[in-house]
Amino acid sequence: MATNWGSLLQNEQQLEELARQAVDRALAEGVLLRTSQEPTSSEVVSYAPFTLFPSLVPSALLEQAYAVQMDFNLLVDAVNQNAAFLEQTLSSTIEQDDFTARLFDIHKQVLKEGIAQTVFLGLNRSDYMFQRSTDGSPALKQIEINTISASFGGLASRTPAVHRHVLSVLSKTKEAGKILSNNPSKGLALGIAKAWELYGSTNALVLLIAQEKERNIFDQRAIENELLARNIHVIRRTFEDISEKGSLDQDRRLFVDGQEIAVVYFRDGYMPRQYSLQNWEARLLLERSCAAKCPDIATQLAGTKKVQQELSRPGMLEMLLPGQPEAVARLRATFAGLYSLDMGEEGDQAIAKALAAPSRFVLKPQREGGGNNLYGEEMVQALKQLKDSEERASYILMEKTEPEPFENCLLRPGSPAQVVQCISELGIFGVYVRHEKTLVMNKHVGHLLRTKAIEHADGGVAAGVAVLDNPYPV
């Protein structure tokens, strides 16, 4: 995609002045992170990295991503309710991947005891890149779906004003008017509020499971503030706090510090290093409760790479979403090529394909949080090591998406403004709420655009690679 900011990106003096104005506006709007030096304190903060200009995104692909989000919500919820599918899909993975196995063990314990919760809440973000087709036109391809701790809905609500400001400074008022309004935090809070309401106790609270060191706290506060505006109170606690002060009564109602909890919202618990033995016990306690969990353990498992790969098999979508051929077609149109690495002929063929053309593939473990995927020579070495080992079942292989690079200027604290070749990743936030078997809410609630220099193969904003951006529809 060509950029219409080309001439602006060549004027170094103008860029420096614009960058100063943009940073000041970002700080004024609350596009903030705590510093890496003081991740537990808000005494000193910095702006979150962002692009100086919004990046061009084809309107048709933006509309397609929005149109399919409610289908993805339904699909995740269908996987959540299909214990047999989850068990069959993850059977080889849990033998080789300890983290997935621990999550699945909690899932089995909860099923055996009987699921206490009647309200189910999903706050998802489906991420896409724009694949360059052979004829040069871009196509929407899903990278992953995040079913736990899908972040930046708060900060993404604050960046449109920054880009409108930059374009207004340049007297580009018509262009400024094309920046889409975007407020994911409001929509995410609506989902939490609906789950809280259905829980049915006006004195109950929302519990946000937080990390001790949380640089991205302002993103979370945006959702907390939306809830407080509805007179719904949020308490922030760590897994360690739950171990010490969490309990269930005989009806499996959850209490923390003596206060009843209606909804548990996880902003922690998606990576192995976030769990001590004590934390695993706390997670089990939360899962056994009748509070609505966002996500519950089955929904977290539904977001694994292995489930994503299995959903791409012929017939799987039809089995999970019977009688919904239009939804199935919309979903399938976004799938990239995904391959199992389970032991056997199918896995052997996938490895042979990747070794023959490594630039076309990416090797993905069952991990969230960014920066875990393997590319190029690293992938080749890993596949050679894994080729004859059952450990390979803990990975999947995915066809690499190759977007058309474009120029933009990246702004980061402590670094000069940098004009580089970039690629973008578009995320769409989705919310659904189910009460027992009845779906009471299913909607898309906003978007997130992240952009990074092309030399970075993997990693998001939190991993220090990508920066916040806005789509400029063309």
Curated annotation (Swiss-Prot):
Catalytic EC class: ligase
The record's listing under Pfam families reads: GSH_synth_ATP, GSH_synthase
Pathway(s) annotated for this protein in UniProt: Sulfur metabolism; glutathione biosynthesis; glutathione from L-cysteine and L-glutamate: step 2/2
Q: How is the cofactor bound?
A: Binds 1 Mg(2+) ion per subunit.
| Chain sites annotated for binding Mg(2+) | 144, 146, 368
Q: Which sequence positions carry the modification called N-acetylalanine?
A: 2
Question: One GO cellular component from the entry?
Answer: cytosol
Which keywords does the record carry? Acetylation, ATP-binding, Glutathione biosynthesis, Ligase, Magnesium, Metal-binding, Nucleotide-binding, Phosphoprotein
Q: Which cofactor does it need?
A: Mg(2+)
| Reaction catalyzed | gamma-L-glutamyl-L-cysteine + glycine + ATP = glutathione + ADP + phosphate + H(+)
Residues that, per the record, bind ATP:
144, 305, 364-373, 375, 398-401, 425, 452, 458
Residues annotated with Phosphoserine modification: 415
Q: Which domain of life is it from?
A: Eukaryota
- Tell me the GO molecular function terms: ATP binding; glutathione binding; glutathione synthase activity; magnesium ion binding; protein homodimerization activity
Q: What is its EC number?
A: 6.3.2.3
Binding locations of substrate: 125, 148-151, 214-216, 220, 267-270, 450, 461-462
What does the subunit comment say?
Homodimer.
PANTHER family given for it? GLUTATHIONE SYNTHETASE
Q: Which family does it belong to?
A: Belongs to the eukaryotic GSH synthase family.
Q: What's its job?
A: Catalyzes the production of glutathione from gamma-glutamylcysteine and glycine in an ATP-dependent manner. Glutathione (gamma-glutamylcysteinylglycine, GSH) is the most abundant intracellular thiol in living aerobic cells and is required for numerous processes including the protection of cells against oxidative damage, amino acid transport, the detoxification of foreign compounds, the maintenance of protein sulfhydryl groups in a reduced state and acts as a cofactor for a number of enzymes.
This protein is called: Glutathione synthetase
Native source organism of the sequence: Macaca fascicularis (Crab-eating macaque)
Gene name per UniProt? GSS
